[in-house]
């Protein structure tokens, strides 16, 4: 299973430089940062900025914009994606529902995320870029299933699943049995969609073996940066070492 390293665009360390020619290190960056900068090299803007010759994904930064109260328009994200055109995968603008959202507010976020995917997909189609939709997990699975079906009916090349972290980690305000239900939802998406499935934010070594068993294609993590700051590395299958 593929594991992408989430990274700020100007941060260090950059492990892909250390493993150059030895190991492919796919990375994920956020449009939340890219919206503030301009390409340095229009021939390969992202690869030049990151000093990376391998695979790069771009997340829309929807959660970051939402958590900071910033309203980002679809046209603005389309501009960023067009300027930084050399990534292999681009995720749609999403509005993750919180476990504490009531069903009305949660469904409004699902509706907006779907509308954004449709609009952004049409805009980027002109640039030859295919956008990946995101379906979020939420405690009211009736709502989730309706929007999952709507996304599958649009026949995307890949689906990303978000909103799982609070349910997998069983934080406050999530229903009893949430971890099992969230993992069952991942399995349902894999089975019903039948295509490539990426799970957002669950690249912990203790979780990735489970995702692989469920048939997930890829996931991502930013935890490696926190551990690296303390001189640690993450070990496949769980655990860490100095």
Regions found by a protein language model. Give the residues of each.
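Glycine/Thr-rich beta-alpha phosphate-binding loop at enzyme active sites
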Residues: 101-108, 130-198, 204-209, 213-216, ...
């Amino acid at each position: 299973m593929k594991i992408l390293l989430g990274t700020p665009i100007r941060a260090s360390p950059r492990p892909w430089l250390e493993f150059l020619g030895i190991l492919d290190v796919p990375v994920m960056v956020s449009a939340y940062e890219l919206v503030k900068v301009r390409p340095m090299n229009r021939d390969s803007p992202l690869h030049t900025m990151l000093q990376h010759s391998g695979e790069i994904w771009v997340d829309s930064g929807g959660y970051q914009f939402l958590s900071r109260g910033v309203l980002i328009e679809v046209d603005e994200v389309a501009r960023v994606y067009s300027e930084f055109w050399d990534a292999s995968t681009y995720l749609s603008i999403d509005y993750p529902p919180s476990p504490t959202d009531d069903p009305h507010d949660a469904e409004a976020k699902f509706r907006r995320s779907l509308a954004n995917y449709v609009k952004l997909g049409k805009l980027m189609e002109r640039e030859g870029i295919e956008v990946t939709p995101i379906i979020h997990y939420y405690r009211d699975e009736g709502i989730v299933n309706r929007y999952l079906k709507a996304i599958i009916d649009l026949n995307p090349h890949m689906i990303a699943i978000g909103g799982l972290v609070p349910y997998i980690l069983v934080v406050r305000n999530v229903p009893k049995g949430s971890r099992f239900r969230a993992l069952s939802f991942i399995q349902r998406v894999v089975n019903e969609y039948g295509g490539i499935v990426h799970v957002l934010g669950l690249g912990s070594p203790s979780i990735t073996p489970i995702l692989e068993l469920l048939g997930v294609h890829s996931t991502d993590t930013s935890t490696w940066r926190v551990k690296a700051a303390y001189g640690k590395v993450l070990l496949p299958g769980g655990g860490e070492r100095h």
